[in-house]
C-alpha cells in the first residue's frame, strides 16, 4: 500500500456506503485524535521499540491524511498541494544546500532559517516576532520558544551565570511569598506568579545549556515513575499497603530503587 491507497481508503470510509463515525468527523475532531496519536508516538520513541514506533507513525500519518482529505472534499487543497508546498519551503530554507549560500556552523543555519522564515511571513517592524508562536503550545514548550525568539533580538543575558543568578533571585522571592502565605486571608495568585517566574527562568537556563526543557522534564518524570513503581512492587511483595509503610522505610526503598534501576 502507498499514499494513493491510504487516500482511497479514507475516501471509502467517508463515502456514501462508508463508516458513520468516519463520515461524521471534522477537522476539529480529527485534530484531537491527531494530538493523542502524537503523544502515543512520543511514548513509542521513548521506548525505543522500532515495531511500536512504526505502528504509531502509521496512526499519525493516517490522521494527517484524513485531515487533508477533509479539506480536499471542500476543494481547498489535496495531498499534492501539501507535499509540494512543503518541498518548496524546505528547498527555500536550505540555500546552503540548494543555493549558493555558505554557512559555518549549526548556529548559522538556525539564524538563516529564522531570517528566511520571517521574510516568508512578511514580518515588519510593526509586527511582534512573537506573534507566530502558537498560543496552544504546551506551556513549557511555548516558554522555550518565546525566550528563544526574544533572545534573537539581543534581549538576553550575557551568559548562563546571569540566568542562574536570576533563578536564585526568583527563588528568594518565592520563599518570601511562601512566608507571607502563612498569614490569614492571603490568596495564592501571587504565589502562582512567583512560581511561574522560577519556571520561566529555568527554561532560559535550559536554553543556555542547549537542553530542551520539555525533554528534560519528561525524562525526569519517567525516572521518578520507574523508581516509584519499583517501590510499589517491593511493598506489594511484602503484602503491605503503601500507606502502612513508614516514611523511613519508603526512603530506604527509594534509595534502593535509585541504585538498582537508576
List PLM regions with ranges:
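Flexible "arm" and connector segments at domain edges
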Residues: 1-56, 62-195, 200-262
